[in-house]
Regions:
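N-terminal "first-domain core" detector
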Residues: 1-68
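Beta-strand-rich binding-surface signature
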Residues: 53, 73, 134
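Short, low-complexity cationic-aromatic patches
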Residues: 45-50, 74-78, 129-130, 168-177
């Protein structure tokens, strides 16, 4: 008998050729940074730096399934979902969000992982006609040389990016609202489930530290 594996899928939009999926990759901040609630790159007890995020998976079955499927991934911050919901509640006509990230250790060629994500809405197409599927999500995966910025961050070194895979999915207003709304509600439920214990643990440690300092 196969094990009943726990799936981290939150919401999915699927046609006979395309798939868009949001997945749970949320992580708690260390107790020392309890008020962040979501991990934001703080150093964990094991020495690693974790980031709380929602995974984005796009798949293209146009050329067949199995090894013919094109699959790309990216990550979004938890704050993106309430943000886009608030925009949608204001009779949104256009929306334009783009983000690119480079991360991970370089390979033998000095290249690191790159994700490029674009989420746009245009109610009218270039031909002037109203679009039935106004939302377009594009994810691109590739490799590039990671370069440090003067502020201490990293970015893609100019001229080094190599695209590996790209998938786009067009979505109508109702389906896009549904997957974003369900994800926003999940994030809220996650915060209400795990946040209280994190806050209690942090306040107890803080009280213990204050008591020890007064002795």
């Amino acid at each position: 008998m196969e094990d009943n594996r726990i799936q981290n899928q939150i919401a999915i939009y699927m046609t006979n050729k395309k798939l868009c999926e949001f997945t749970d990759k949320l992580k708690l901040a260390p107790v020392e940074y309890y008020a962040h609630m979501h991990a934001q790159g703080e150093e964990q007890s094991d020495g690693f730096r974790a980031y709380s995020c929602i995974g984005v998976v796009l798949q293209d079955y146009s050329n067949g399934k199995g090894d013919k499927t094109v699959r790309v991934t990216a990550n979004l911050s938890p704050g993106f979902f309430p943000f886009v919901l608030s925009r949608m509640q204001n009779d949104l006509d256009r929306f334009d969000f783009t983000e690119e990230k480079i991360f991970g250790d370089p390979d033998e060629n000095g290249l690191s992982t790159v994700t490029k994500l674009s989420i746009k809405r245009a109610s009218v197409g270039n031909d002037g006609k109203r679009r039935n599927y106004p939302w377009c999500i594009i994810v691109e995966n590739g490799r590039a040389v990671k370069e440090k910025t003067p502020s201490g961050g990293t970015h893609i070194k100019s001229g080094t990016y190599k695209k590996l895979r790209s998938v786009y999915v067009n979505i109508n207003d109702l389906d896009f609202f549904n997957i974003v709304y369900r994800t926003a509600r999940f994030i809220e439920s996650w915060e209400l489930t795990f946040g209280p214990k994190l806050i209690r643990d942090a306040r107890k440690l803080l009280d213990d530290q204050r008591a020890a300092a007064q002795q």
